[in-house]
Amino acid sequence: MDIAIQHPWFKRALGPFYPSRLFDQFFGEGLFEYDLLPFLSSTISPYYRQPVFRSVLDSGISEVRSDRDKFVIFLDVKHFSPEDLTVKVLEDFVEIHGKHNERQDDHGYISREFHRRYRLPSNVDQSALSCSLSADGMLTFSGPKVPSGVDAGHSERAIPVSREEKPSSAPSS
């Protein structure tokens, strides 16, 4: 059986009008303009893939900052309410878990769940940890650092998530 292999510089006559990037979509995050106009990318090359950097930054990547005075985690959880989130400190780790049951949105029914685990620096004061959810869905987990030589206190406990009415001051990537 002979299989015809098409050179990348030659395209089908209607090739630009067929969506060929089905697996580039971030399911549950909606569509961008270039998802609706697939012929723009295939006119360059049939092997061209849209950059996903913008989509990845908007899809829940966290940012961890650890400076001299404090430790902060920023996490985009815009699809979750404070009741859907659980934040626990287990020895040297903070575990953030989010889950919401199936609900209807513009495209059908969807359920989401994530689990993130971060190592806390040894000099973070675990008795002063706080967690808040901004109006735009940015979860901020923070704790002050203590001078070296002072016991930071390690224990297992749940951190309540408080709701803020203002948007986050986290950097937009």
From Swiss-Prot:
The modification Phosphoserine is found at S45, S122. Residues 153-167 have a biased composition (Basic and acidic residues). The modification N6-acetyllysine is found at K70, K99. Glycans are attached at S162. Contributes to the transparency and refractive index of the lens. Acts as a chaperone, preventing aggregation of various proteins under a wide range of stress conditions. Required for the correct formation of lens intermediate filaments as part of a complex composed of BFSP1, BFSP2 and CRYAA. It comes from Zalophus californianus (California sealion). Heteromer composed of three CRYAA and one CRYAB subunits. Inter-subunit bridging via zinc ions enhances stability, which is crucial as there is no protein turn over in the lens. Can also form homodimers and homotetramers (dimers of dimers) which serve as the building blocks of homooligomers. Within homooligomers, the zinc-binding motif is created from residues of 3 different molecules. His-100 and Glu-102 from one molecule are ligands of the zinc ion, and His-107 and His-154 residues from additional molecules complete the site with tetrahedral coordination geometry. Residues 52-162 form the sHSP domain. Zn(2+) 3 binds at H154. Keywords: Acetylation, Chaperone, Cytoplasm, Eye lens protein, Glycoprotein, Metal-binding, Methylation, Nucleus, Phosphoprotein, Zinc. Residues 144-173 are annotated as: Disordered. GO terms for biological process: lens development in camera-type eye; negative regulation of apoptotic process; protein refolding; response to heat. It is found in: Cytoplasm; Nucleus. PANTHER family: ALPHA-CRYSTALLIN A CHAIN, HEAT SHOCK PROTEIN HSP-12.2-RELATED. Zn(2+) 2 binds at H107. Signal peptide: none annotated. The modification N-acetylmethionine is found at M1. GO terms for molecular function: metal ion binding; structural constituent of eye lens; unfolded protein binding. Residues 1-63 are annotated as: Required for complex formation with BFSP1 and BFSP2. GO terms for cellular component: cytoplasm; nucleus. This is Alpha-crystallin A chain. Belongs to the small heat shock protein (HSP20) family. Acetylation at Lys-70 may increase chaperone activity.
